[in-house]
């Protein structure tokens, strides 16, 4: 599939997701970076969003809890180009009942070429990048062109 440019605005739409055993780590990371995150729009799965809002006061648009469809909601937003960055602290040592949703979420983030951090070290690298707070371009699939070709 051909690729086209997508511009990520200075103010990013950032999705925050964390498995149960990783929520405290994500919450600590958000607290440490709350000043910088306050300049962006935050979205999160249900429990994670509640915790972030309660402990930091940051405004967070909350989806359903991950196992109840929240991961899929975030994935749909990625496909609709409504999420620019995914911060997803997932637990590789414990299986979750909605593991197919987790895989689908990471797959969509890769398909749509958005920056993804799956642990604190990567999240630190990402948030410290100059691109985090400035307009930048990414390459994404040319879905409209793909459809045009397929429907000839």
Swiss-Prot record:
Please give the SUPFAM superfamilies that the UniProt record associates with this protein.
Answer: Methylglyoxal synthase-like
SMART domains, alphabetized: MGS
Record keyword Transit peptide present: no
**Any single GO CC term annotated in Swiss-Prot or TrEMBL for this entry:** cytosol
UniProt xrefs under Gene3D superfamilies: Methylglyoxal synthase-like domain
Residue ranges annotated for the MGS-like domain, each copy included: 6-152
**Keywords for this protein:** Lyase
From the UniProt record, list the reaction(s) this protein catalyses: dihydroxyacetone phosphate = methylglyoxal + phosphate
The record's InterPro entries line, in alphabetical order, gives: Methylgl_synth, Methylglyoxal_synth_AS, MGS-like_dom, MGS-like_dom_sf
Keyword field contains Transferase: no
On the tree of life, the source organism's domain of life is Bacteria
GO MF entry, a single one: methylglyoxal synthase activity
Q: Any idea of its EC number?
A: 4.2.3.3
Sites where the protein binds substrate: 19, 23, 45-48, 65-66, 98
| NCBIfam families, sorted | MGSA (TIGR00160), PRK05234.1 (NF003559)
Name-wise, this protein is Methylglyoxal synthase
